[in-house]
């Protein structure tokens, strides 16, 4: 075994024959061959390195590979196994070496060349010491940091890291991403800088060419994290799908300007195609512009700008249709702006602005979820303060809020009051076991078609906390005062009214624990009884306006609320005692809550009740309906979520919901949920009143593998009272065995109005560590199928497991 160490311009040769010393050197080499050292453990490059071809591997999309990993294997690059050498030294280890000092060295057999972070394995190498250049063949493997290059012939300058190789296979790993390529030639242009010609590349496992990009040339710069391809075609399953004369892409997953993958879908409005372009304007500023075409509607232009600074951040979005062919409307748009500014450690401000061109915008361009959630669009500016004052905590907020209210299909809109402005202040201070506090709120309400005015609410209170490890008692005394100054409106005169109500309540509870075995393991089970007494005297409030109060549905949480109305315009009368008990099951090792269930009821000592119109009525009763719930995991596979509101006087359920989910493994989900309501708010009628009716819905959904690679996704949501499905969704997803790609196709039909539906068909193609084509299925499936995971994510997760 021969070795060479060099440091330009000084050369120190050990065991290398020069002139008359060859015989002695041969003797040393022979002795080392008979007595191997650690350096001789280097394996011959000619044995493990297979002949290189210009193919990434198999292009078969549906080939079976039970291991889920590539079949093609190659030996790793081997070092000399000797002690480290100083920086900028070059070491050559081989079976045989000959040459002339400071001129050129010829090395053959198990050649290993090492310099700094570069290691070269090859069959033979010519080393030019004056130029610090090595020429290698017939096969070589060059390892440098996260880059591995294999090929047939190589000319390489070790100092400048420049050179050229032929019939090359390259693998680059950076930022958790893997890029592999095969090329006719590869030029090394400096550290981490390469130019490849006649190349194919992808981000799959070795031997997997289910998809790849074929290009006349690719220039990759690891320092900049950018690759540029010229005359490139996207090949899927061996078939060219898309061509571009120029394209660039990130090597490390960082953001960069350029075309994003187009999005294609089909539905009730025809085929839609969007081609977005991304602008990486600065590390903290970017933008996206996406021109689109919707078959039956025409051209659409989408734009988005995002910004991020240490003290503020925000995002603005704009969608514009110059002319909607289907509706005949011009200049349809949607605009959004969200901004948050941290002015100081105690002061924050923000903007939330939303606007659309017309009331039908969401019905025409969105699904039923977005339609229901965007009736009143916020346009709000706010300023919040959180700090200390007078020995206690002080929180204050100033906001202005005005809505854009969209009309329903009948043309009616129920517009809320605008807050012009609202100022809220809350101060609290702990003194021993007591806490004193006061909350105040001033609001100027504004409305175009109703009497408006100003309201001041002041609510001082004091509460005590007597608690220990097994229980607590928390009394509270408060005085709720409300003052109104109402403006003249039509025949309604301007006036001032007020209301003052004392509020007294006592909250108490206890916790009992025991260790037991349940669900196949050690758990901690609790039993937690709770009593809540609440007193508020009856007072007629029909002379007060109703700016923002609404009824809350009766459930387990309502047993422990002071006021059963939302808002401050209505305060219920109360002389009642709530009694409830809940039990929780905690993991014995981690303390994580796995399951909880509870049941409770309210007992009334008076029949008075304040109605939503402010009048005081009588409700003969001595106790409320029963409310109960149960939710959590049963074992490791089942999830339960249920609740019920039971009217014991009429012996019937007012509403209930029962849901169960079976999840034996990722990608295997079965969900079933039934919801019933005897008298539920269904929709807003044209006269401004709500239509109430029985609600009875069944929601079934699933994601389940049909084969090792193919999964089905379905949802069926049926309304029994309407006697029609609310939403139907079906899809099929495929994941490649090695996790290189995943694809899905989905069809959906859903209700958008009382007698209207929309249809949609969309597809997705996810490419490992590169991009996605089409819509991201998770955007819709997360809601449609609880527990859903994309096929590509599932495949990637499986590949990560040992």
UniProtKB/Swiss-Prot annotation:
Keyword flag Transferase: no
Cell location: Cell outer membrane
N-terminal signal peptide: 1-25
Entry GO CC: cell outer membrane; transporter complex
GO biological process: Gram-negative-bacterium-type cell outer membrane assembly; lipopolysaccharide transport
Keywords: Cell outer membrane, Membrane, Signal
One Pfam family it belongs to: LptD
Organism superkingdom: Bacteria
Primary localization class, coarse: membrane
Further remarks about this protein from its record: Present in outer membrane vesicle formulations which are used as vaccines in human.
Complexes and interactors: Component of the lipopolysaccharide transport and assembly complex. Interacts with LptE and LptA.
Family membership: Belongs to the LptD family.
Function: Together with LptE, is involved in the assembly of lipopolysaccharide (LPS) at the surface of the outer membrane.
Identification of the protein by name: LPS-assembly protein LptD
Organism annotation: Neisseria meningitidis serogroup B (strain ATCC BAA-335 / MC58)
Gene this protein is translated from: lptD
């Amino acid at each position: 075994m021969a070795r060479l160490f060099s440091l330009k311009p000084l050369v120190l040769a050990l065991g290398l024959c020069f002139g008359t010393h060859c015989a002695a050197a041969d003797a040393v080499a022979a002795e080392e061959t008979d007595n191997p050292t650690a350096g001789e453990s280097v394996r011959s490059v000619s044995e493990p390195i297979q002949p290189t071809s210009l193919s990434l591997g198999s292009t078969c999309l549906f080939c079976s590979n039970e291991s889920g990993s590539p079949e093609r294997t190659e030996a790793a690059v081997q070092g000399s196994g000797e002690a480290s050498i100083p920086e900028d030294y070059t070491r050559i280890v081989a079976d045989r070496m000959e040459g002339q000092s400071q001129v050129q060295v010829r090395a053959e057999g198990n050649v290993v060349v090492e310099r700094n972070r570069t290691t070269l394995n090859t069959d033979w190498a010519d080393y030019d010491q004056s130029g610090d250049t090595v020429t290698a063949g017939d096969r070589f493997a060059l390892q440098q940091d996260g880059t591995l290059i294999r090929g047939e012939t190589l000319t390489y300058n070790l100092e400048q890291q420049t050179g050229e190789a032929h019939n090359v296979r390259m693998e680059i790993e950076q930022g958790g991403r893997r890029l592999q390529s095969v090329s006719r030639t590869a030029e090394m242009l400096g550290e981490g800088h390469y130019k490849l010609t006649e190349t194919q590349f992808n981000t799959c496992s070795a031997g997997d060419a289910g998809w790849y990009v074929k290009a006349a040339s690719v220039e990759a710069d690891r320092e900049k994290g950018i690759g540029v391809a010229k005359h490139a075609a996207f090949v899927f399953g061996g078939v060219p799908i898309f061509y571009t004369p120029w394209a660039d892409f990130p090597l490390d997953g960082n953001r960069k300007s350029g075309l994003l993958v187009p999005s294609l879908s089909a539905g009730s409005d025809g085929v839609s195609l969007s081609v977005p372009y991304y602008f990486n304007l600065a590390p903290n500023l970017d933008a996206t512009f996406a021109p689109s075409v919707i078959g039956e509607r025409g051209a659409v232009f989408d734009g988005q700008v995002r910004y991020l600074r240490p003290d503020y951040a925000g995002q603005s979005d704009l969608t514009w249709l110059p002319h909607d062919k289907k509706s005949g409307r011009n200049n349809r748009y949607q605009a959004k702006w969200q901004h948050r500014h941290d002015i100081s450690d105690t002061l924050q401000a923000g903007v939330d602005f939303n606007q659309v061109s017309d009331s039908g915008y969401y019905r025409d361009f969105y699904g039923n979820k977005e339609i229901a959630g965007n009736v009143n669009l916020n346009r709000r500016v706010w300023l919040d303060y959180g700090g200390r004052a007078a020995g206690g905590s002080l929180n204050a907020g100033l906001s202005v809020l005005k809505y854009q209210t969209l009309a329903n299909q009948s043309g009616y809109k129920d517009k809320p009051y605008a807050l012009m402005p609202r100022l809220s202040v809350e101060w609290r201070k702990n003194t021993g076991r007591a806490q004193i506090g006061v909350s105040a709120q001033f609001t100027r309400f504004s409305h175009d078609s109703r009497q408006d005015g100003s309201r001041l609410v002041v609510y001082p209170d004091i509460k005590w906390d007597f608690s220990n490890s097994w229980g607590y008692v928390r009394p509270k005394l408060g005085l709720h005062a409300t003052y109104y100054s109402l403006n003249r409106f039509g025949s309604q005169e301007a006036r001032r009214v007020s209301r003052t109500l004392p509020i007294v309540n006592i909250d108490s509870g206890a916790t009992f624990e025991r260790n037991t075995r349940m669900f196949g393991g050690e758990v901690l089970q609790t039993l937690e009884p709770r009593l809540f007494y609440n007193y508020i005297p009856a007072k007629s409030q029909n002379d007060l306006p109703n700016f923002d109060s609404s009824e809350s549905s009766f459930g387990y949480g309502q047993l422990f609320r002071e006021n059963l109305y939302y808002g401050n315009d209505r305060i219920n009368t109360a002389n009642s005692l709530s009694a409830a008990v809940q039990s929780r099951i905690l993991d014995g090792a981690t303390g994580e809550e796995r399951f909880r269930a509870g049941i409770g009821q309210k007992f009334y000592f008076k029949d008075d009740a304040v109605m939503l119109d402010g009048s005081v009525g009588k409700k003969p009763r001595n106790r409320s309906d029963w409310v109960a719930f149960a939710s959590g995991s049963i074992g490791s596979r089942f999830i339960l979520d249920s609740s019920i509101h039971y009217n014991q006087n009429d012996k019937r359920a007012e509403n209930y919901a029962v849901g169960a989910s079976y999840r034996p493994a990722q990608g295997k989900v079965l969900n079933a949920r039934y919801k019933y309501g005897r008298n539920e708010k269904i929709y807003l009628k044209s006269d401004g009143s709500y239509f109430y009716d029985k609600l009875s819905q069944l929601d079934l959904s699933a994601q389940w593998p049909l084969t090792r690679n193919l999964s089905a996704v379905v949802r069926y949501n049926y309304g029994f009272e309407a006697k029609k499905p609310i939403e139907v969704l079906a899809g099929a997803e495929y994941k490649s065995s090695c996790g290189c790609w995943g694809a899905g196709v989905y069809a959906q039909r859903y209700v958008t109005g009382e007698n209207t539906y929309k249809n949609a068909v969309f597809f997705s193609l996810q490419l490992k560590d590169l991009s996605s084509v089409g819509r991201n299925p998770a955007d819709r499936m997360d809601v449609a199928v609880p527990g859903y995971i994309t096929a590509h994510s599932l495949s990637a997760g499986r590949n990560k497991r040992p």
